[in-house]
Amino acid sequence: VSGGLHGVGSSVVNALSLRMDAVVRRDGKVWRQSYERGVPTSDVVEGEDTDITGTDITFWPDPDIFDTVEFSFETLRARFQQMAFLNKGLKITLTDERQQEIDDDDVQLEDEETEEFKPREVVFKYDNGLLDYVAYLNSAKKSETVHDDVIAFEHEDKEQAIALEVAMQWTTGFQEGVHTYANTINTHEGGTHEEGFRTALTSVLNSYAREQKLLREKDANLTGEDIREGLTAVVSIKLGEPQFEGQTKTKLGNSEARNFVSRVVRDELTHWLESNPANAREVVRKAVQASQARLAARKAREATRRKGLLETSG
């Protein structure tokens, strides 16, 4: 899938690099071309035969453009792990072959044996995709999970060229953690896909709570904040023609995404609630407790405000 600006990524890397080498394996051949500061240094060269496909891009950032050309292993590690979660079954290997700097105090004498240099390497591959992602996120939290299994589902509409993958699990904590992506880009400002998810989530949980008499007739509906308290969720949508707001691509604007996500989440979550009544009751009970705490806090604030007004007028 594309991030929305077709071909621009490699063009920009090429323009900002002192040198870039491209090796492409396709049509049974290996093709090579090199560039310097975005300008080809030769024509495309046809190489040996091959029965595999794939592309190798090697580039050297231009030190005249960037303040630093040092790559952060941890930054790359975090992004590649995220990409592996978002692309079920994809294997990503990150290797750092740079010699690590040695402090003066650690310099060995000539007669001391030196260990053979071993590059740092991490491999990411998640066969369960977002289900593994949510389990990973919750494993780092101190709170326990409300239900054991991660709720996970996916749906694709080939005619609309749109696909959705969702994974979610409630914890006993109080923080909401809803993470959204569009074509594997982190849309931390949300957008239409997140709006569809939130709307469906609130509607389905309230309907279920009413049907199961977990909310009394006189009780107000649970708010979205009540329901999402302690929730860890990842929503990943892939579209043929993504529309992002601004060049930062942190907010999705496709109107069709809202309806698609809302419909799929409504159907799948309703099915999960009906198929897992014990877990469903625990999820609703947590939301009801959040609602009660919110209302109690509001009453306490109002009482404090009234007391302050009386003391002022007195």
Identify the residue ranges that each predicted region occupies.
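GHKL-family ATPase ATP-binding module
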Residues: 1-3, 7, 11-15, 19-314
